[in-house]
């Protein structure tokens, strides 16, 4: 996979997590704030659009969303 494809996949995975929970960008911003990560809605939108965010930020999002397990299988995201 190219780096561009990996960015797109990272973005798709996080967008799918939000969609399955029927959450909006503002909901993620609120959840991140509760775990000590301050991100504006526009910053979140930009990161998801570009797919350029660190794995640490992805982990923060997962923790904020209450996920305890992460798999890379498309069927289990």
Functional labels for PLM-detected ranges:
Residues 1-24, 30-31, 70:
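A short, Lys/Arg-rich alpha-helix, primarily the initiator
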Residues 13, 27, 56-60:
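Short Gly/charged-rich anion-binding patches and loops
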Residues 21, 32, 36-37, 65:
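Core residues of bacterial helix-turn-helix
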Residues 33-52:
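Recognition helix of helix-turn-helix/homeodomain-like DNA-binding domains
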Residues 53-71:
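DNA major-groove recognition helix of helix-turn-helix/homeodomain DNA-binding modules
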Residues 71-77:
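Short amphipathic recognition helices of helix-turn-helix/homeodomain-type DNA-binding modules
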């Amino acid at each position: 996979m190219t780096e561009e494809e990996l960015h797109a996949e990272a973005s798709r995975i996080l967008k799918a997590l939000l969609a399955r929970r029927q959450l909006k960008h503002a909901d993620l911003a609120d959840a991140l704030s509760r775990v000590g990560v301050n991100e504006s809605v526009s910053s979140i939108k930009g990161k998801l659009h570009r797919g350029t965010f660190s794995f640490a930020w992805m982990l923060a999002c997962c923790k904020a969303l209450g996920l305890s397990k992460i798999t890379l299988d498309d069927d289990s995201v």
